[in-house]
Amino acid sequence: MKFCIIGYPVSHSISPRLYNEYFKRAGMNHSYGMEEIPPESFDTEIRRILEEYDGFNATIPHKERVMRYVEPSEDAQRIKAVNCVFRGKGYNTDWVGVVKSLEGVEVKEPVVVVGAGGAARAVIYALLQMGVKDIWVVNRTIERAKALDFPVKIFSLDQLDEVVKKAKSLFNTTSVGMKGEKLTVSEASLKGLYLVYDVVYFETPLVSDAKRLGVEHVVKGNLMFYYQAMENLKIWGIYDERSFKEVFEEVLR
């Protein structure tokens, strides 16, 4: 079978390397490629992708757009974002990755979620499934945050530091930090947190600062990616536990 990841940009993705190594170790004759699709070309290119590939993963900024072209699962419908597709059906495995990556960790409230895109939707849905009720969303545009359609309080980005100061947990669902940028959160506000979670799967300044300041629980996106990838392979019907652990644990855990 043929798989790929679609996004823009997508050159930073470690998915092709990991999945192809997994296929090799498991003795599977599958391939996993990369398709960089600018937003303005999406409607044309997605039709080709659906014809050419058995399955694919969608990342920023395409998780919400994909919904229009696939038959979404119940979870994906509620989240309004798809990150895993198999033969015309769309799933959201991000939220599963969030829940599993937080096993054994108490998510203390209030919880601040930075961002209002596809990843934010999955994080909020996961938190609600875990019984978290007091969720505060901080986003650059208030209108986009309102469109989330979840029971959350909404704040603008210029309120981020004062909101974090009153919170116990912080989830960054944006790409801020991928290139070394920092969220506008003071050290004093960060220090008062119990949990810091960043969906970016390598160490961002937020994660480094939280560790240095002694935040009790600091979770990188690599754990979310690990469990999300496991779920993807199960959906595609090609999960092999031993090969998965050999390849994915080596890199991600």
UniProtKB/Swiss-Prot annotation:
Coiled coil: none annotated. Keywords: Amino-acid biosynthesis, Aromatic amino acid biosynthesis, NADP, Oxidoreductase. It comes from the Bacteria. NADP(+) binds at residues 115-119. It catalyses: shikimate + NADP(+) = 3-dehydroshikimate + NADPH + H(+). Its EC number is 1.1.1.25. One of its GO terms (cellular component) is cytosol. GO terms for biological process: amino acid biosynthetic process; aromatic amino acid family biosynthetic process; chorismate biosynthetic process; shikimate metabolic process. Pathway: Metabolic intermediate biosynthesis; chorismate biosynthesis; chorismate from D-erythrose 4-phosphate and phosphoenolpyruvate: step 4/7. Belongs to the shikimate dehydrogenase family. This is Shikimate dehydrogenase. It comes from Thermotoga petrophila (strain ATCC BAA-488 / DSM 13995 / JCM 10881 / RKU-1).
